[in-house]
Design a protein with these regions (language model features):
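Structural signature of nuclease core domains in nucleic-acid processing machines
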Residues: 1-355
């Protein structure tokens, strides 16, 4: 309880627009407890910063990054030609880069009710958050247009072509916090334990190739692993038969070699997949699915993973095209800026036994 109290104190402080790092919290906790009493908290962000190629700003539960990647080309999967409107900049092209900007976007999406069609209320909310994060409020209408893309873009056939605006507010669970215990037969969980999961379900995304990358993280932890899922929601004709999905908002900037920023054509499958691997999002997504799996097992009567556990969606906010033009195109492809994968159940079962 004392540890929770300390974490809560730091979690609630939003002073000078700075995000508290977990190191600050651990130092405070260590002053209260001696080493043999201390139970540590880790997070996805604290794990990935052990990769020398990653510089993550973290707090107890959330990571707020605004990563920048430069690509060589913008060819779509299977070398398909992209329509002209995929070269129209996303409304967030003028939005600031950096951690504070990423935090601001997350807070706006968190607070906004997707089915609220009152544009003035949305503008007021956006201006409030822009002011709080000390960002130019003249960008409010651009941010509003970006939010409308987020909630109105089709999520593809795997999700019955649903849009976020189609999901009733009462079924949208935002900012779902979780804690996973880290104990495997009384010893620390390490990178090798976790990497073994990605040798399973090789027909799914991020298999052996990614498994070998996890060992770079040098994970060695006991205690608790804490995280927060941006959004969880069901898709199906009946709630009891619905599949549940996790969705994570990413404000990463994928820039073309010609300095083209925030163009949907830059956010194709291959580029998003590379971005996922680079920042260890596969690890994050599998931890999210494990947390969702345990929640559904606890809360759903007659829960069956193959029936109810849907998968994960990574939505790159700066890569979404105009939703009206995309809908008119009647494209059967997934929109740029959306990366989707069904739940790899063997991997989730492995992690469920490990954690």
């Amino acid at each position: 309880e004392k540890i929770k109290e300390i974490f809560s104190k730091f979690q609630n402080k939003r002073l000078n627009n700075n995000l508290w790092k977990i190191d600050n919290v651990n130092k405070k906790v260590s002053n209260v407890f001696n080493s043999d009493q201390f139970i540590s908290y880790s997070s996805y962000s604290s794990w990935i910063r052990k990769d020398k190629n990653i510089d993550a700003v973290i707090n107890q539960y959330k990571d707020y990054e605004d990563n920048i990647s430069i690509i060589k080309d913008s060819n779509f999967k299977n070398s398909k030609n992209y329509p002209n409107y995929f070269s129209y900049p996303n409304p967030l092209s003028e939005f600031p880069k950096g951690t504070i900007a990423g935090t601001c976007l997350h807070k706006i999406i968190e607070r906004f009710e997707f089915r609220n069609d009152n544009n003035q209320e949305l503008i007021d909310l956006i201006i409030e958050e822009l002011n709080f994060h000390q960002i130019d409020t003249s960008l409010a209408f651009k941010v509003k247009d970006a939010i409308l893309r987020i909630i109105n873009i089709s999520l593809g056939r795997e999700l019955q072509n649903k849009k976020l605006v189609d999901i009733p507010n009462e079924y949208l669970i935002k900012e779902l916090k979780y804690d996973l215990t880290l104990s495997y037969e009384g010893r620390n969980i390490n990178s090798n334990d976790i990497s073994n999961c990605f040798f399973l379900d090789q027909e799914y995304e991020f298999g052996e190739e990614y498994a070998n990358k996890i060992n770079d993280l040098q994970i060695m932890n006991k205690g608790f692993h804490s995280g927060c899922i941006d959004c969880v929601f069901p898709v199906g004709n009946k709630l009891e038969d619905s599949k549940w999905w996790v969705i994570d908002w990413k404000s990463n900037l994928i820039s073309g070699s010609d300095n083209s920023d925030c163009l949907p054509r830059n956010y194709n499958y291959e580029n998003m997949r590379n971005e996922m691997i680079k920042h260890h999002y596969p690890l994050q997504s599998h931890l999210y699915l494990l947390a969702l799996h345990r929640l559904l097992k606890w809360r759903l009567k007659n829960y069956q993973p193959h029936k109810h556990l849907g998968g994960y969606i990574y939505l790159f906010l700066k890569g979404l095209p105009d939703f009206e033009l995309f809908e008119k195109s009647k494209s059967e492809d997934i929109s740029p800026g959306i990366f989707i994968s069904k739940a790899p159940l063997k991997r989730i079962n492995y992690l469920d036994n490990l954690f």
